[in-house]
Curated annotation (Swiss-Prot):
Gene expressing this chain: IRC15
Name the record gives this protein: Increased recombination centers protein 15
Note, other: Present with 6400 molecules/cell in log phase SD medium.
Broad class of where this protein is predominantly found: cytoplasm
Residues binding FAD: D47, Q48, R49, A50, S51, L52, G53, G54, A55, Y56
Protein localization: Cytoplasm
Organism: Saccharomyces cerevisiae (strain ATCC 204508 / S288c)
Keywords: Cytoplasm, FAD, Flavoprotein, NAD
């Protein structure tokens, strides 16, 4: 015997043969397993976490959005004078972090059980354990307290997600120096909380602890926060957060972080512009400088692969590795933004590529919608003004303040900020009037962005949007008005405001 036959001859514990094996059960892995099973394929899924749902559910989007909302309510309730102007009388608010974490843990378990029930209902076999390649079609699964066994699969979907990037000189101990994952499970509120990294994850966690009373400082090595954001939006976001009490140290690198005998963290910082170093003090430092594909433990080197193959050598039409077309990486292990919606769309594409029917194609993920869930929320989709200028695409823009919107003025009281007013900006192609980008600041940006994303991904024109009746009064009317302004190249089209 030789090759694969030789390997198989040493496999004493051979468990099962599947059409599809999915490694990882976050949003992408779950979607792939469901799609495959519903297409009539014998499917199994393996995940090493105690609860299904991946980092997205356990220590990512779900915990962060939950704590953002709860901390925002607390911040709002503290502003008694602002609320009493609307007629509501309140007792002083108090926030119990331990109770919040207990409720969050219960919520995560319940959502994990939803994943489990749906997979069971669709006859997907679930293994709780680790997975490692033995050869291109065989994977060893190790479950706690059990002898490892081998699973064979015709197709293998790799959806193992991502892990935080470590920083040289700043060792994460998850005590004083923590990851973003650990930050979302803290059961206390640090007095001085410093965050290394001004991306979306860092900013959202900054908002949580700032709302709860921590003195928050963000250290960012670049000259601006959120590098993929429209410049106007990024500048407005920074100003809004500064007005809420968050401090920013831009063009600044963390060189070293050490705790003294009293437990205080002493962080050596280097300003890239002045070239000067100085020491910053805090109680907790969170490292949030990005994430990288999580492939450790899969033993991909045993089949001649490395991390670059998952990023560079993938047929994006079928989500297939060029070397092994039956191995299909999806989600955070692939090139592009690390978003759940990207993972889900890639999962659908991967399963459809093996000849399965299902939903009619996948969405256009070239410009995925993005939301920063601070208060107010920041949302954007499509081209930025800088991107259009770089691509030499002629464009027109329309910008509308939400303060001019009837519905906006009937909603919850909000902190007044004389520097930045919530707005929506629409960018359209001057040649064919296609909607190229939409950028907004609003408490409900996550919901409003859906219609903007539809317009951008479907290639709708400004004329298409203007033909659609919008409910009144509604926040969405501001989107239509911004489109009309863009058509008129920023001059008022005399929009009639209904009473």
């Amino acid at each position: 015997m030789g090759g694969e036959d030789e390997i198989l001859s040493t496999m004493e514990d051979f468990a099962a043969v599947y059409d599809v094996l999915v490694i990882g059960c976050g949003p992408g892995g779950f979607t792939a397993a469901m799609q495959a099973s519903q297409a009539g394929l014998l499917t199994a899924c393996v995940d090493q976490r105690a609860s299904l749902g991946g980092a997205y559910l356990v220590d990512g989007a779900v915990p962060s959005k939950t704590l953002l909302y709860e901390s925002y309510l607390y911040r709002l309730l503290q502003q008694q004078e602002l609320i009493e102007q609307r007629g509501t009388r309140l007792f002083p608010a108090k926030f119990d972090m331990q109770a919040a974490q207990s409720a969050l843990k219960h919520n995560i378990e319940e959502l994990g059980n939803v994943y489990k029930r749906e997979l069971s209902k669709n006859n997907v076999t679930v293994y709780k354990g680790t997975a490692a390649f033995k050869d291109p079609h065989h994977v060893e699964i190790a479950q706690r307290g059990m002898k490892p066994f081998i699973v064979e699969a015709k197709y293998i979907v790799v959806a193992t997600g991502s892990a935080v990037i470590q920083c040289p000189g700043v060792a994460i101990d998850n005590d004083k120096i923590i990851s973003s994952d650990k930050a979302l499970s803290l059961d206390y509120i640090p007095s001085r909380f410093t965050i290394m990294g001004g991306g979306t994850i860092g900013l959202e966690i900054a908002c949580i602890f700032n709302n709860l009373g921590s003195r928050v400082t963000i250290v960012e090595s670049q000259s601006e926060i959120c590098q993929n954001m429209d410049n106007e939006l990024a500048s407005a976001t920074k100003t809004l957060l500064q007005c809420q009490g968050i401090a920013f140290l831009l063009d600044t690198r963390v060189q070293l972080a050490e705790a003294d005998a009293a437990g205080q963290l002493n962080i050596t910082l280097l300003n890239k512009v002045s070239k000067k170093t100085y020491v910053h003090h805090c109680d907790v430092l969170m490292v949030s400088i990005g994430r990288r594909p999580l492939l450790k433990g899969l033993d991909i080197s045993s089949i001649g692969l490395d991390e670059r193959d998952f990023v560079e050598n993938v047929d994006v039409q079928t989500q297939s590795l060029l070397k092994y077309p039956h191995i299909k990486p999806i989600g955070d292990v692939t090139l592009g933004p690390m978003l759940a919606l990207k993972a889900e769309e890639q999962a659908i594409r991967a399963i459809q590529s093996i000849g399965c029917t299902g939903s009619d194609g996948t969405s256009n993920c070239g410009f995925p919608p993005n939301v920063l869930y601070c208060q107010p929320q920041i949302g954007w989709v499509g081209y930025t003004e800088e991107g259009l200028a770089k691509a030499r695409i002629p464009y027109q823009k329309g910008r509308v303040l939400f303060s001019q919107n009837v519905r906006y003025n009937t909603l919850l009281p909000r902190e007044e900020n004389t520097t930045v007013s919530p707005f929506i900006k629409v960018l359209i192609d001057s040649r064919d009037m296609k909607i190229l980008g939409v950028h907004m600041i609003n408490d409900d940006a996550n919901e409003l962005l859906s219609q903007a994303s539809m317009a951008v991904s479907l290639g709708l024109t400004a004329h298409d949007v203007c033909k659609v009746p919008f409910p009144h009064p509604s926040l969405s009317e501001s989107f239509k008005q911004a489109v009309q302004l863009a058509m008129a190249n920023g001059t008022s089209p005399g929009v009639h405001v209904r009473e």
